[in-house]
Amino acid sequence: MSGSLWMLIGALVLGTVTAAWWYSGRQGGSMGETVKRLDRAHPVGAVDRDKRQEEAIQLHPNAPGIGPGLSIGALGEHGDRRLYQGWRECSVHVWGTGRGKTTSQVVRHAAEAPGAFLMTSNKVDGVTEVIAARRDRGRVWVFDPQRILDEAGEPTMTIDLFASVEDTRTADEVAAIFESASAGAAGASGRDPQFDSQGRDLLSACILAAAEDGREPATILEWITSGKLRDPETVLREHGHTGRAAMLRGISQQPDDTRGSVFATAQRMASALSHDALVRWATPTTGVRRFDPGAFVDSDDTLILLAQDTAGSGAAFVSTVLHTVFTAAQKSARRNGGRLRVPLVADLDEVGNVVKLPALAEWYSYFGSMGIVVSAFFQTKGQGVTMLRHTGWETLWSAAAVRVYGGGVDDDKFLEQLSKVTGKYDHRTQSYSTSRGGGRSTSVQTQQREILPVDKLAALPPGRAWVRTNKGGGTIVRTLGWFADPPLAAWINEGLDEMKEVD
């Protein structure tokens, strides 16, 4: 028997043992009993279909055909009563590898999104299914400079990378993205905290000057590597940014050693702009479609952003594109009275492996109210802490209206946190005793136990997810892979067949 077959058998046996342990009466009862305890402690009735549909129509009266929300999973052991993420809610997910987050969440959300949909990923899994699911909608835009989906690598779209930059604040946000990506790539040994602040300010000023004057991204790197700041300083003064212009003048007048270190730091942060293959996707090209973030957020188009280096050039570009889209969405929402006419759905799949967005935690505090519905998928809590630092992760987790754990994680501290908020139940035991005279007495003892202890959360069976909402509700749901939904599976498979015929 081959080694691979033995591995398959071993995996099946392990899965069977895990499921049997969960469904047995040990360690606090069966799955059904656990769910009943959760429902008693944290009822989730406020997020079912009827109430979600009513809420959706109230929030988006000019979005005909809008559904109740994004499916998270099904309640109970049978039937199709679903738990939804509403159109004013953002979610945070932690799913271990191979747990079905893409098939049960991202692909399904792509099909359910009533307007524009965007996703990120570092692999091809789910990408073709998303394209097939949305083939009856608007255009599909694929940003794939690292040739993950298309080996040819020729740009199929270009974008104004700094379209969202219009003042010092937005320039600082984009500079922070490049800093975050480059910091991970360089590691601690490649950073000098003494000059990080000035280097970031220099990069921000050059980004602002390039955006105001309509320069290409490569110009920013030329300014920084040459050490000559007269050109960007002049541009900034002409556009009324006298403070940033004065800052550039000050950097130019620093002692040689200090100035050299500041420029070296800024050059490291802008290193993504040295990759010509990436910059081509941000340079207008005859015959190549130009992506307009403002038009996208008000459309029913699909945007797929692919990158493979968490800390580096690809992450910097993908994250900056996200910044342009989210900035455009906020502008559109404000023009429409504070909320998008039709929700923008953004599933940041593999966010810990693709994206560097320092502002993500802050955005979660108000994006939902604007109809910008974001779902961020991490493989571990550690990924979130790496991306946002501990405080940022805690802010993101707390600000999320829906929090989902899809299993497959062995982080005891994280699981203890979930166990604590899930709560306890009163476990009653009876004992009997017989006196010498033959009399029999019964005593009842009550002991508080965790509804979901750490070991049970760690062994969460495949196809199940722990969910908690900001309304206090919490439960275990059955995840809904698109392939197990006959109508959706038929639609997507038909689209996949059509794509094969075109190829």
Indicate residue ranges for each PLM-predicted region.
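Basic- and hydrophobic-enriched, low-structure N-terminal and domain-boundary segments
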Residues: 1-99, 103-105, 152, 435, ...
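Short intrinsically disordered, low-complexity coil segments enriched in acidic
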Residues: 2-5, 417, 475
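Glycine-centered flexibility motif
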Residues: 73-76, 116, 214, 380, ...
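P-loop NTPase motor domains
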Residues: 87-88, 92-372, 443, 447, ...
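Conserved ATP-driven motor cores of ASCE-family P-loop NTPases powering translocation/secretion/packaging/pilus
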Residues: 364-471
